[in-house]
């Protein structure tokens, strides 16, 4: 994706209500900043990582969709796991919103984390040591698909 002053984040906002930057994630040592940029029509989402010392930006992953890229319903559901050289990506590529694990170096899919006729609403917490993800989802349980439940995988 070439530089373009009209590019936006996937949320259309640069900062949240509390002033925090959206669609960004710092490494623990603040040496790297992961961020998502999007085309204005939101048909393209692009994960990139900037080196905070040099300013160099590495292209990590790009998803193109026919309609509108959505990174989650209540939050941006992507994470870079700098310690394990992986990243979690949210996609509706199977017509449902699910999360996928990719290798950060090779950019190859390692694992489909969630599947089924339901959707992940929000990644709540990732325990890197136990390799567990806590997330909310809708439509997984019988009954009202709008009821949201907390899960661990």
Language model features: what each stretch is:
Residues 20, 33-34:
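Short, hydrophobic/aromatic alpha-helical segments in well-folded domains
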Residues 46-48, 98-100, 149-151:
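A short loop-to-beta-strand structural motif that recurs across blades of beta-propeller domains
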Residues 16-17, 42-44, 98:
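Short catalytic/ligand-binding loop motif for oxyanion handling, primarily in non-cytosolic enzymes
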Residues 71, 97-98, 137, 148-149:
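Low-complexity, flexible helical/coil segments
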Residues 26-28, 34-41, 51, 77-94, ...:
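Beta-strand C-termini and the immediately following turn/loop, strongest in propeller blades
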Residues 1-21, 50-76, 102-127, 139-140, ...:
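Multi-bladed beta-propeller domains
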């Amino acid at each position: 994706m070439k530089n373009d002053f009209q590019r936006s984040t996937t949320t259309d906002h640069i900062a949240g209500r509390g002033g925090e930057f959206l669609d960004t994630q710092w490494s623990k040592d603040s040496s790297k900043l992961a961020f998502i940029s999007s085309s204005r029509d939101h048909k393209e989402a692009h994960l990139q990582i900037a080196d905070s010392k040099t300013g160099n930006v590495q292209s990590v992953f790009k998803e193109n969709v026919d309609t509108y890229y959505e990174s989650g319903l209540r939050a941006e559901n992507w994470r870079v796991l700098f310690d394990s050289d992986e990243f979690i990506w949210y996609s509706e590529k199977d017509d449902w919103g699910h999360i996928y694990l990719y290798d950060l170096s090779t950019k190859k899919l390692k694992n489909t984390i969630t599947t089924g006729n339901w959707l992940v609403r929000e990644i709540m917490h990732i325990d890197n040591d136990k390799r567990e993800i806590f997330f909310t989802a809708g439509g997984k349980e019988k009954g009202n698909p709008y009821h949201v439940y907390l899960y661990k995988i």
